[in-house]
Regions:
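A short, active-site helix/loop in glycosyltransferases that binds the activated sugar's phosphate group
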Residues: 125-126, 162-170
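Histidine-centered beta-alpha loop that forms part of the nucleotide-sugar donor binding/catalytic region
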Residues: 10, 63, 119-120, 140-143
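An amphipathic, basic-hydrophobic alpha-helix
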Residues: 74-114, 152
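Membrane-proximal helix-turn-helix segments that form the acceptor-binding/catalytic region
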Residues: 101-109, 143-166
Length: 170
């Protein structure tokens, strides 16, 4: 039986992290030794911005109707539209709750042998809810740029992971 590798992602839109995730998934799929799954919380676009090998399974945890509403929330705040601000705040809380809940459910119930996490909050969830039988890898793409709080958050988030990979030099 082939081993399964899952890569956790916030979304598959534009960005260096997203490009790296897809590049890794495609490279692993081409080896033909593993079943590869990208698990994306948000589906921001109908089709991924980057080409994904047909052997890579992509799973979206939230419907495309539930996507970040930061822009709408900021506009309501900036324009002092209090009713809109209240609605957008509630929507934001709902999205964040579902984002967390859906990823926890995936991590708890997956049959993946290896899970690669790509963000601090995903490291935290993988650390807390990942099975002891699963190889857990954190993969950090951001440089801390002398932001010690961020560096501390990263360090704290990986304490229960098996491995940690830094993309940029610290």
């Amino acid at each position: 039986m082939r081993k399964k590798i899952a890569i956790l992602s916030l979304h598959l839109g534009y960005g260096g992290v997203e490009k790296a995730i897809i590049s890794l998934a495609n490279s692993l799929a081409k080896l033909g030794k593993y079943d590869i799954e990208i698990v994306s919380i948000y589906k921001l676009y109908e089709k991924s911005v980057f080409d994904i090998d047909e052997k890579v399974k992509v799973t979206y945890l939230l419907s495309s109707k539930l996507s970040p509403n930061r822009k709408e929330w900021s506009e309501a705040l900036h324009n002092l539209k209090l009713i809109s601000l209240g609605k957008e705040s509630l929507k934001s809380l709902k999205i964040l709750y579902r984002r967390r809940k859906s990823m926890i459910n995936y991590i708890k119930n997956t049959d993946a042998n290896v899970i690669i996490s790509t963000r601090v909050f995903l490291n935290e969830l993988l650390s807390e809810y990942g099975s002891d039988n699963t190889l857990k890898i954190g993969w950090e793409h951001n440089h801390y740029h002398d932001d010690m709080k961020y560096a501390t958050d990263v360090i704290r988030s990986i304490k229960k992971l098996d491995y940690f990979v830094l993309v940029s030099k610290g």
